[in-house]
């Protein structure tokens, strides 16, 4: 006889499915391979409807541009977010298999309130879900950071978060910035204070190893754009980040919406081993 614990879980595991590097994989196939569902399935989209290349995926619209970095296109090279088709088919597929949808959406911070309300209303039918808005916004590579200041990005998050809470109360907003710094403060803490307060969930992305020069160079000793860090370093960074954010903005959940070890850097064996070490830590 086996005993089951019906209380709250000690942790939860989500699965990213599709990004700038990969197509969406249907949930029947994933469940057949892994044998069990996850709490949520993450999907990634972009929304820049006023750009001249829209609604094409930007890498296809600008296939003749001289690009040397994944994020050098006019807007982010995720699949385009639109009112019908791909995003909604995927969310229905996720929900059919008893999982929550975790949408990441990079979008134009100059969109009107009417346009933002339209996006929020489209999320109503999909039950409990999260939306991560303009993620990794402490960086410089995504379009929202190229076109807007950090303060503008933070204020936009808070404003869009308010609209989502009004129009789609089933949706929790996720603010994804950086980690606590050497001085103890969060990265861009002052500029992002309003966003930390407005969010339902905080996130910080974590790649123990990452080939960020993909697909334009090779991750090899002496060449290529890549990095590798220790499990212990990231575990300490998460702890310090949560403690600082909670002390300044009240306790909220902190997740890592993107976590992996890039097999381009480590190879598949160490990729799996390092993820296990992080989970055990």
Which residues does each PLM region occupy?
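Glycoside hydrolase catalytic-domain groove-lining segments
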Residues: 61, 66-76, 82, 207, ...
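N-terminal carbohydrate-binding/catalytic regions of secreted carbohydrate-active enzymes
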Residues: 12-125, 274-281
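Hydrophobic faces of well-ordered beta-strands that scaffold small-molecule active sites
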Residues: 6-15, 39-43, 101-105, 129-133, ...
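Active-site groove signature of glycoside hydrolases
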Residues: 120-150, 174-181
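Aromatic-lined carbohydrate-recognition surfaces of secreted/lumenal glycan-active proteins
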Residues: 162-188, 249-265
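Structural recognition of alpha->loop->beta junctions
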Residues: 125-129, 139, 189-209, 278-281
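Active-site beta-loop-alpha junctions enriched in small/polar residues
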Residues: 14-18, 43-48, 106-110, 134-138, ...
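Distinct, well-ordered alpha-helical segments
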Residues: 115-119, 181-197
């Amino acid at each position: 006889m086996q005993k089951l614990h019906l209380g709250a879980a000690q942790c939860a595991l989500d699965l990213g499915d599709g990004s700038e590097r990969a197509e969406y994989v249907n949930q029947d196939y994933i469940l057949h391979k892994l044998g069990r569902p996850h709490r949520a399935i993450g999907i990634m989209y972009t929304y820049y409807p006023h750009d001249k290349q829209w609604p094409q995926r930007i890498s296809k619209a600008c296939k003749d541009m001289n690009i040397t970095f994944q994020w050098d296109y006019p807007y982010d090279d995720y699949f385009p977010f639109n009112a019908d088709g791909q995003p909604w088919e995927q969310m229905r597929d996720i929900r059919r298999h008893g999982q929550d949808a975790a949408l990441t959406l990079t979008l134009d911070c100059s969109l009107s309130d009417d346009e933002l309300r339209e996006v929020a209303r489209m999320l109503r039918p999909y039950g409990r879900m999260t939306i991560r808005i303009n993620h990794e916004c402490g960086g410089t590579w995504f379009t929202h950071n190229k076109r807007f200041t950090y303060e503008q990005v933070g204020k936009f998050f808070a404003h869009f978060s308010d609209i989502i809470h009004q129009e789609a109360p089933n949706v929790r907003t996720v603010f994804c910035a950086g980690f606590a710094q050497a001085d103890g403060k969060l990265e861009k803490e002052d500029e992002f204070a309003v966003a930390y307060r407005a969010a339902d969930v905080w996130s910080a992305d974590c790649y123990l190893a990452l080939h960020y020069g993909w697909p334009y160079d090779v991750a090899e000793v002496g060449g290529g754009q890549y990095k590798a860090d220790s499990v212990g370093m990231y575990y300490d960074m998460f702890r310090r980040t949560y403690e600082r954010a909670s002390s300044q903005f009240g306790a909220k959940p902190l997740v890592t919406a993107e976590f992996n070890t890039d097999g381009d850097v480590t190879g598949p064996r160490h990729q799996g081993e390092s993820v296990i070490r992080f989970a055990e830590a």
